């Protein structure tokens, strides 16, 4: 009888609705969501574009962007899909910026379902659970993608349609985004992106595919003054990373954060020192490309507390990637 009850309990947790976590045997969890406003209306905003006024947020499994949506339009809670495990949270700006931001967590429990419910951008201020800790600015944040055109990163200003679908399953939480007819300069392509998080560690997996050969497709890591870039390849050169560590958060002038992107060497054309980002430029292909992002906040409970611990962790992951081609 106890085994039957335990099995039923596990199934309930695994098949839970979109605003509940997926619990795992190791007591970790994963969760992803997107939350949109309903019951309000579009009005002329103070920033020169339409804003969504009134209504209440509701979690949905899938969503097609309203043509009037842009940054700070207030129709999507914390501006895009979010994903987390017990160590870290992330969010992606589902608009022209297409940047990835970081939620630093001070607790090991699920938090995203409540983030932004008490005020659209209250997560910029310190909360008991943590806060938004990264200032992305004009950059791609940590692992967002764009296209390098004449030494300038073109974000997703011109996209005909954007569709996102969220999935919470037994061993992973993820979301997929289909960008239809992304235009940069004289080039147009559809793009599919899949982002996944697991119940352990701090990394998140990105799978990216363009349907037309695209020169200059790039991801990036936001640059901060006086924070040096570190680069390293695995022993056989099959994988590499770019990373930064230091006082580079919104919290206070002494707060420490490590950020990294792991990439497959045979998928990458070059590394570029961009204006706002450290860039990883991919070779043109219509095959799916894979990379991983990782954020380690010094205030994370039982986390990586200093630069030495951070880079030791990255180097151990390079060994793992070389051995198994995955984290």
Model-derived segments and their meaning:
Residues 114, 234-267:
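A recognition module on extended beta-rich or small alphabeta surfaces enriched in W/G with H and D/E
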Residues 1-4:
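Positively charged n-region of N-terminal signal peptides that target proteins for export
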Residues 15-16:
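C-terminal motif of bacterial Sec signal peptides marking the signal peptidase cleavage site
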Residues 191, 202-234:
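Acidic (Asp/Glu-rich), glycine- and aromatic
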Residues 164-171, 199, 211-216, 282-288:
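A short, structured loop/turn motif at beta-sheet edges
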Residues 70, 259-327:
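Beta-strand-rich recognition/accessory modules
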Residues 125, 129-199:
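Extended, loop-rich substrate-binding clefts of extracytoplasmic carbohydrate-active enzymes
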Residues 21-155:
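Solvent-exposed N-terminal domain segments of exported/luminal and surface proteins
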